[in-house]
Amino acid sequence: MTEATQRTSDNGVSIWLDDLSRSRIESGSLQDLIANKNVVGVTTNPSIFQKALSQVGPYDAQLKELGKVDVETAVRELTTTDVRNATDIFREIAEATDFVDGRVSIEVDPRLAHDTENTAKQAVELWEKVNRPNAMIKIPATLEGLPAITATLAKGISVNVTLIFSLERYEQVIDAFIEGIAQADANGHDLKHIGSVASFFVSRVDTAVDKLLEANGSDEAKALEGKAAVANARLAYELFEKKFAEDPRWADLAAKGAKVQRPLWASTGTKNAAYSDCKYVDELVDKHIVNTMPEKTLNALADHGNGAPSIEGTYEESHAVISKLAELGINLKDVTDKLEADGVAAFIKSWDSVLADVQSGIDRVNA
């Protein structure tokens, strides 16, 4: 373990890798990151699978076994195999942490982002297909996704809620989570191993807000560049602490073994070269947090990160940042609404590419 990744972990942050591929599993790379860089979980998304499945070679043997199946079936077989194999690698960590960590996430078809019924249906299908207790099903935090989150948790299925950008939506996600756990309890499920994280996206907020600040051009605007995303995430953590401390339903559920839905910082790779490549890790360290990071960010953290606690005592400053943005005419809700819509659209585009790449693979191995 490196000093920085160990310190980050010791201060309450579970380090998950935001990447997965057949070659990463078969090469031993994933096991190496577990052994040497404190990695205790994995997240995937359509863009990650697009990158993985575009590789010619690693998936050919399985494609040959599948034969001339339809492309949707092939994609699900390939992706769930990777996730299943990864969950097996993490099983020891899952058991050692009482299934808090050792989790591997797989996302529902992004084309269902605004379809509650079919999102909930596919969540069950994916859970049963992977068939591992340390898997997590990713569901987007669209308005239509919220009831699907509750319905999925109510069946005892672990959920990673993704594409959260705003405090307003995050509060709705926490409410959907608590309601889902309450229903799971009423349905007779053991609450101890139902896991959930709320994936709150970080760096994309700075990318969007900084453009507006640059367009403003004032000294006040310049002083706020690179501050919106961390302030927004820190206020999400404030909300996390407040909601779980004050919601009367949660105390009863926790007494029955339910585990808190941890905030997960996503989109933590630095997009602006002027900022530290550890910015969205080092500035967001506290207890009961997950940070999922691309390997480049993980390597930066391991090499020169800090990992010291960095959220406590920052709420007043963070509220001030958001207020100053509003004074400059920047409505953060407008920004985050667009980021959610853009995020769904980007994942759909990636999924379409996945389907095209796998169809090419099917045609190639069956030629």
Residue ranges and their predicted role:
Residues 157-296:
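Catalytic alpha/beta core domains of metabolic enzymes, predominantly
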Residues 1-30:
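N- or domain-start disorder-to-order transition segments that initiate the globular core
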Residues 258-363:
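Flexible, acidic glycine-rich loops studded with aromatic residues
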Residues 45, 106, 137, 152, ...:
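Conserved, mostly hydrophobic/aromatic
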Residues 24, 115-121, 139-153, 166-180:
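Active-site-adjacent beta->alpha loops and helix N-cap segments on the catalytic face
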Residues 48-148:
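Active-site beta->alpha loop and helix N-cap motifs at the rims of alpha/beta catalytic domains
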Residues 12-16, 40-43, 101-105, 134-138, ...:
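Structural preference for beta-strand elements that scaffold enzyme active sites
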Residues 18-22, 47, 107-113, 140-144, ...:
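Active-site beta-loop-alpha junctions enriched in small/polar residues
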